[in-house]
Amino acid sequence: MRFIPLLLVFSLFAQDDVGAPPKSGTTGSIGTVTLNGQVYNQLSIRPEIPIGKLGVGLDIYLYFNDEGMYWDSWDFSSGGSAYKTIIDKIYYLRWGQPGDNLYFMAGALPSVTLGQGILVNNYANIMEYPQVRQVGLNLQAKVAGFGIELIHSNFKSATPGVLGIRGSRTILPKLSLGVSFVTDLDQLAGLPDSDGDNYPDYYDYYPDDENKWDDYSSNQSLYDHHFEFYKEAHPNATLEEFLNEFTVTKSNYSPENATKDPISGLAIDATYTLSEKMTLYSQFGLLQGEIVDPEDNTKTINPGWGLVPIGARAKLGPINLLAEYRMGSRRFVFNYWDRAYDVNRVFVDASGVSTRESQLYLYGKLNGFYVQADMSVMNLFTLSSGYQYMKGEKWDKDLNKYETGETNKTFLSTISINPSLIPRVEKAEAF
């Protein structure tokens, strides 16, 4: 099943802050999916049912095309099928709100930030939903004067893309310190595996058959026997040459011997609350992993570090402002675990399989600023825009070295519109 989001996404969150976890309300989306080779329209309504501090988020969806409805996702023919159908419609479970003594959201995580966000900022485990349905957890608790936060992006995987923990404590009346640790135990685990046979599609000649991944393994003894006869006429032939001549596929991937490619990050931050509407902070982040040295590909090197010596958050009427001065060493990118992390965690290109970490060499020493503004206008729409301008080094693939005087600019903007004429709809977002 493949999900292709449209530019228009209805988000009916009963909330004020852009990107904040949803409070009681209704969300929804429209789009298209491909099921068994057929394209269907998708209509999804996501209400939240509040029960005291508990919120149960549901995902009630329909697939249809010009030939009719797709009912396989609404199967009540047996007890087991009915149970699977009902469980499949639970989008998340929520207890309390961020800032409470105990808060958690389990299931879909639409937006999670750890600390001030130098490592994990606005992460979402729903970017490939419903093609990939992850069951994550964001837990926040206050215990004996300490703040504790936990992020787990997917309990359905032994190697989730985001596994993070943070501890914080107020050391002075308005000053708090925090320490965060984040890891991706194996970036390569993000490769798609459509049939769940532990052979990623990239290495699987039969990606939709859970019992077969190549021709050779399905009847290895037979092919080995024929190869012995083949060698009598071709004594210097290899097994691969024999299989290629007779177009017999053989995957060189082995789940038992597959190497893992982890990456981790450590962050420290200090936050000073000037008032209810303004906060100052400083944060430092360090990535730990192993990438090929672009200047000598026989060596491996560690990723780098980033520093925000001063940052500020402020609320001015309907406007929420954020500003940071950023400094980064080579091989560091701010907000490494961002909203799109699950999408670019690992990818396949002309050179083969590459990870997000492997591309860090493209970033040289950079200094600059980042600003963001969220503005609500007469409760009609909310505009959120972020801009980063960094200057310094950038890797030049043609010259095979870092060039100075280069810039790195990024811009992201979203708009949320309140369609008051639509019953029960509180917000619609366009990206």
Predicted regions and their residues:
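Positively charged n-region of N-terminal signal peptides that target proteins for export
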Residues: 1-4, 274
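Short glycine/proline- and aromatic-enriched beta-strand/turn motifs that initiate or cap beta-hairpins
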Residues: 15-46, 346
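Short, solvent-exposed loop/edge-beta patches enriched in aromatic
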Residues: 47-56, 97-101
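Gram-negative (and chloroplast) outer-membrane scaffold detector with strong preference
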Residues: 87-103
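Acidic, small-polar-rich N-terminal luminal/periplasmic segments of exported/outer-membrane proteins
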Residues: 63, 109-110
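Surface-exposed loop and membrane-interface regions of Gram-negative outer-membrane beta-barrel proteins
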Residues: 56-92, 119, 292-293, 299-300
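Signature for the C-terminal beta-barrel architecture of outer-membrane proteins
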Residues: 19-23, 38, 68-70, 101-103, ...
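Sec-dependent N-terminal signal peptides
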Residues: 3-13
